């Protein structure tokens, strides 16, 4: 494999229904085996379910949920003098979004509802209300960073 250049980041196109890049990234994260049609129908059905249940715009609920899921701090392992320290660092904006989407989809897949659209819709609504497994994951990450605050001076 060539080590000459780093592959350029490809621009994500906004989805046709909501004109949002975040929704496209959610569809890409849900997609398995290249089945984009299935993934987009899951997301759009979940969004219509959210609109029915809350009465609010599904995109706004989703963006609120993402704000509640995305972490601000995380810990990174740093080797200093023969021992590893968990050093708290701020999360870059791109990584914040990636982690938020990853945690949302993982938490949705772990839920008990019958269909994926139900699971995704319920997890997004829970996250918008600051509850649910994905928000708990963020809280755990922040707690870990807070607990290791003493090692913040090892930041690089």
Swiss-Prot record:
Belongs to the universal ribosomal protein uS7 family. One of the primary rRNA binding proteins, it binds directly to 16S rRNA where it nucleates assembly of the head domain of the 30S subunit. Is located at the subunit interface close to the decoding center, probably blocks exit of the E-site tRNA. GO terms for molecular function: rRNA binding; structural constituent of ribosome; tRNA binding. One of its GO terms (biological process) is translation. Coiled coil: none annotated. CDD domains: uS7_Bacteria. One of its GO terms (cellular component) is small ribosomal subunit. This is Small ribosomal subunit protein uS7. PANTHER family: RIBOSOMAL PROTEIN S7. Part of the 30S ribosomal subunit. Contacts proteins S9 and S11.
């Amino acid at each position: 494999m060539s080590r000459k250049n780093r592959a350029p980041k490809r621009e994500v196109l906004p989805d046709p229904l909501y004109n949002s890049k975040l929704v496209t990234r959610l569809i890409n994260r849900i997609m398995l085996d290249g089945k984009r049609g299935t993934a987009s129908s899951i997301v759009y059905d979940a969004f219509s379910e959210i609109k029915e249940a809350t009465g609010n715009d599904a995109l706004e609920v989703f963006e609120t949920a993402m704000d509640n899921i995305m972490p601000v701090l995380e810990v990174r392992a740093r080797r200093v003098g023969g021992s590893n320290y968990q050093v708290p660092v701020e999360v870059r904006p791109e990584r914040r979004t990636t982690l938020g989407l990853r945690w949302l989809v993982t938490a949705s897949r772990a839920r008990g509802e019958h269909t994926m659209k139900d699971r995704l819709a319920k997890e997004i609504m829970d996250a918008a209300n600051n509850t649910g497994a994905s928000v708990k994951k963020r809280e755990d990450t922040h707690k870990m960073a807070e607990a290791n605050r003493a090692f913040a001076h090892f930041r690089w």
